[in-house]
Amino acid sequence: VARQAAKDRRVDLLSFPSDPRKRFFDAAEGELASKALAALEINMASLLSLQGFPRVRLLSRLRWEVEIAKKFKVPLVISSGADNEYLLRAPHDFATLASLFDLPLSSALNSLSEVPQGIVERNRLKLSPSYVAPGVRVIKEGKDCPRV
């Protein structure tokens, strides 16, 4: 399912569970996501709620996935994933936590603000009446531009 989602241009965000055995973001997935303009979500709730060896294993996996994302220029989105108020943190706190998986502070802040904003703007463009297909927009309508 993850491979098919990474190929599909309608998919904006690839999100995986915290269990390392169920995470499938590898080099092939990274290449497909890069071509389809999909971003990789890093859910911080699992990082905050896990303890001991499972947290260490998740951090190791996140380091590996961030390296793959950098290699294939796949944008990262850091999300809180909070399902209660105790998992909420300030954006700068999440950016600092991202240093645990080798993401520089500037990139982490970008993953918290600019990348999600870009996804929202891209989707708003798709919802506009002038949007036809990727790379195709209606520029002018009128008598000299008959509709088919």
State where each predicted segment sits.
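Charged catalytic cores and adjacent phosphate/nucleic-acid-binding surfaces used
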Residues: 1-148
